[in-house]
């Protein structure tokens, strides 16, 4: 195959790390990662597979003890016992050292593994939960990656089936060091590549028969309402679907529907002019029929009788078909302006070659083909098993529009990190069936801000669009705010995009990665870290009738936490039920957090796909913090060679000083000068008089503004990106109180409960009594449980 389809690999392990017997080979890749092979003919596999690319780990420290019963292998992490016979539950075991559990931390070959789960192929037609596959981390300290049946990657870029009857397992025995387990999984299977910047913005997607005219009218309306999008997803009606039955169903197609899109190049050009990128849906399964405009060329290439219009069968097991598939079906469309492809493969995991999953073939080659002109590649398709993280982005499928589906998605996305799959794209708002529920749509869109990809989607039902103006005013406002905020967060998201590649940590990080020994970290299934600076717990249940707030259980680790929406300050080290109205969901920055965003006035696609002239930086007090903003050209693979620029930011709580260091690296990639809007959270009004700003050591006048309602000090500085900026305030201007009386009044004022009860509650809250006394007296009133819960949150935060 062509050079572009050949993958860089280094599959041969160091011989010093191998223990080889007549029919087995044990390879100690690390002191916690063991490859276990058994083959009756004593021939073992040293080539790369579709899952595993790199076995060239450094030399491992281990020792072997041989006795009459077989061998024992010791590392600092593991104790392996093997009788040197065919793998069996009584003959092969590995124990995790470190006293993780009384009896659960020993694995016997063939036993079912109980890990923290991974992900699934799809959520198609799912209402609620779905069974998940395995990950590489477990509370018991170990998990298994079975590579026995994956295809072999050949040097020429193609694949071949593995020899049957072999065992090829990777034992991950990292105890509770989940980060290291994941890091070595990426070391073994390849890194997650960076996404182009535009992918982190909002995607508009709908299964609907748009035309060029109607689509551009819709985009104009979004612009009028300041609702930004960076990606246009054109579902299957871009191509001919109403074909002569002799050509099949029209489900598969590659020829533009000229009635809807008379000039495709013009249409795609208009989207590009807006700063948008485009993906087209393709269902490859039915091959190429005689009605397609490229049929004759494709048929000739494949040796098909084109005069008789015999169909070109979709054969992903054929390298000849795959090369022609791209040459004739996709490259011409890309020349017209298509940026990447939505591979909508729904026909299962079988093809002509036993064990070869067509979905994997399409994902693998589409991704590689997409980078042939030097751009940063991307594809959009379902998950095809371990190793699929190398082909972002994942399409999770056609979910039902229900609260049950929303409630499962944060957990589903979080556990995917356990198998390294960090870029799921869900149908935000759900796809089909279910019911219309304005509140559900608002909450789903809010979750979309804090999911890997924000892609609104819906079915072709005339009643099932996700345009915000289709919903009640409060939902419309919540959706619009969410879509704008997603674009605001692109500088932060792009830095996390790089972190995912460089540091092997996906955007969505389970709580137990940071706190593996805290039982609470495993209990909050829908709570996670969203990058390095935020902790999210999306709302996935309806509001409580009468109180008009929804309840979410949140675990606050030790420290001080700030809700980025409400400004509430929380003491950590506890579990707490928190309540939110429709305007926000629980998202927290830890004390010392630094959140770098785009300016609210520069959210259109043309602005957010480039490195910004204006940055908004939110700084949260009471602890030291640091953040390094990452930037590059946003679209090439230059990041692999280190072509980038970073800007370090640091906050010192003791000095109450925030410092932006000069940009470091290839500064031609960013503006020469920038405007920084520095937002110091939770400040008293006195802060405005105490702020001092210096640029390169020289004190300068800066524009200061105090937001009294939200208790923020906003300092605006214009400076060269090559300069050092320092802002000093005074830590005695940090507003520590939560304005309890005001918050309780605002809640009670909107609550649909009795006036007498409101007066009694508010009178008690403003009585000046100690919090513990107020709580006990409220309890004695036998209030509704949820009403008491709301008041408890405000009083005890």
Show the residue positions of the predicted features:
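Catalytic and substrate-binding clefts that recognize carbohydrates or anionic sugar/phosphate headgroups
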Residues: 5, 63-199, 206-207, 213, ...
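Solvent-exposed beta-strand/loop surfaces of large extracellular or lumenal domains
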Residues: 47-61, 304, 562-582, 688-716
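Catalytic core of carbohydrate-active enzymes
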Residues: 367, 386-394, 408-412, 416-426, ...
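Aromatic-lined carbohydrate-recognition surfaces of secreted/lumenal glycan-active proteins
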Residues: 203-206, 233-234, 276-289, 343-346, ...
């Amino acid at each position: 195959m062509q050079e572009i389809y050949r993958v860089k690999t280094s599959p041969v392990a160091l011989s010093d790390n191998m223990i080889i017997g007549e029919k087995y080979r044990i390879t100690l890749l690390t002191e916690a990662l063991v490859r276990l092979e058994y083959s009756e003919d004593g021939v073992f596999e040293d080539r790369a597979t579709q899952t595993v690319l790199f076995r060239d780990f450094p030399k491992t420290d281990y020792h072997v003890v041989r006795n009459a019963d077989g061998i024992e292998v010791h590392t600092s992490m593991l104790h392996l016992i093997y009788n040197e016979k065919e793998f069996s539950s009584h003959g092969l075991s590995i124990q995790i050292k470190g006293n993780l559990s009384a009896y659960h931390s020993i694995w016997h070959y063939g036993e079912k593994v109980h890990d923290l789960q991974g992900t699934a192929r799809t959520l198609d037609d799912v209402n609620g939960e779905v069974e998940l596959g395995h990950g590489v981390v477990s509370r018991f300290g170990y998990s298994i990656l079975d590579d026995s049946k994956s295809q072999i990657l050949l040097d020429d870029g193609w694949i071949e089936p593995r020899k049957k009857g072999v065992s090829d397992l990777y034992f991950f025995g990292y105890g509770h060091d989940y980060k290291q387990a994941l890091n070595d999984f990426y070391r073994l299977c390849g890194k997650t590549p960076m996404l182009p910047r535009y992918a982190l913005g909002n995607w508009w997607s709908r299964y609907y028969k748009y035309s060029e005219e109607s689509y551009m009218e819709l985009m104009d309306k979004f612009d009028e309402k300041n609702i930004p999008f960076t990606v246009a997803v054109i579902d299957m009606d871009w191509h001919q679907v109403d074909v002569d039955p002799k050509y099949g169903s029209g489900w598969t197609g590659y020829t533009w529907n000229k009635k809807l899109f008379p000039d495709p190049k013009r249409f795609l050009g208009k989207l590009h002019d807006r700063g948008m990128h485009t993906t087209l849906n393709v269902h490859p399964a039915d091959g190429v029929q005689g009605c397609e405009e490229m049929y004759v060329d494709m048929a000739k290439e494949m040796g098909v009788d084109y005069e008789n219009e015999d169909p070109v069968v979709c054969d992903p097991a054929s390298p000849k078909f795959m090369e022609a598939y791209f040459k004739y079906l996709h490259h011409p469309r890309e020349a017209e302006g298509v940026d990447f492809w939505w591979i909508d493969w729904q026909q299962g995991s079988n093809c002509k070659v036993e064990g070869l999953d067509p979905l994997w073939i399409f994902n693998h080659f589409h991704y590689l083909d997409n980078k042939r002109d030097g751009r940063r590649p991307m594809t959009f398709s379902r998950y095809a098993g371990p190793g699929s993280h190398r082909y972002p982005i994942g399409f999770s499928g056609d979910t039902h529009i229900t609260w049950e589906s929303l409630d499962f998605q944060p957990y589903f996305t979080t556990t995917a990190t356990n198998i390294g799959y960090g870029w799921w794209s869900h149908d935000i708002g759900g796809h089909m069936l279910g019911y219309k529920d304005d509140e559900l749509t608002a909450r789903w869109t809010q979750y979309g801000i804090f999911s890997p990809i924000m892609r609104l989607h819906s079915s072709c039902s005339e009643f099932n669009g996700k345009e915000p103006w289709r919903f009640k005013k409060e939902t419309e406002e919540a959706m619009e705010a969410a879509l704008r905020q997603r674009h605001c967060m692109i500088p932060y998201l792009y830095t996390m995009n790089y972190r995912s590649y460089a540091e092997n940590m996906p955007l969505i990080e389970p709580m137990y990665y940071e706190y593996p020994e805290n039982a609470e970290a495993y209990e909050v299934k829908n709570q996670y870290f969203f990058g390095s600076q935020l902790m999210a717990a999306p709302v996935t249940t309806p509001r409580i009738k009468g109180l008009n707030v929804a309840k979410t259980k949140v675990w606050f680790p030790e420290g001080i936490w700030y809700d980025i929406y409400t400004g509430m300050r929380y003491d950590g080290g506890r579990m707490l039920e928190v309540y939110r109205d429709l305007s926000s969901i629980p998202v927290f920055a830890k004390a010392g957090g630094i959140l770098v965003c785009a300016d609210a006035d520069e959210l259109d696609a043309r602005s957010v796909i480039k490195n910004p002239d204006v940055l908004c930086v939110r700084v949260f007090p009471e602890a030291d913090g640091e953040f390094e903003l990452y930037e590059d050209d946003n679209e090439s693979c230059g990041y692999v060679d280190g072509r980038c620029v970073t800007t370090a930011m640091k906050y010192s709580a003791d000095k109450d000083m925030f410092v932006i260091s000069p940009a470091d690296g290839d500064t031609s990639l960013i503006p020469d000068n920038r405007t920084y809007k520095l937002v110091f959270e939770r400040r008293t009004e006195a802060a405005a008089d105490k702020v001092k700003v210096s640029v390169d050591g020289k004190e300068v006048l800066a524009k200061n503004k105090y937001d009294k309602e939200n208790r923020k000090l906003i300092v605006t500085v214009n400076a060269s990106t090559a300069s050092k900026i320092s802002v000093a305030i005074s830590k005695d201007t940090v507003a520590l109180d939560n304005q309890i009386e005001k918050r309780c009044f605002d809640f009670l004022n909107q609550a649909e409960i009795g006036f007498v009860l409101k007066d009694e509650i508010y009178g008690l809250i403003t009585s000046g009594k100690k919090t513990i006394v107020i709580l006990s007296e409220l309890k004695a009133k036998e209030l509704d449980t949820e009403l008491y819960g709301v008041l408890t949150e405000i009083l005890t935060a």
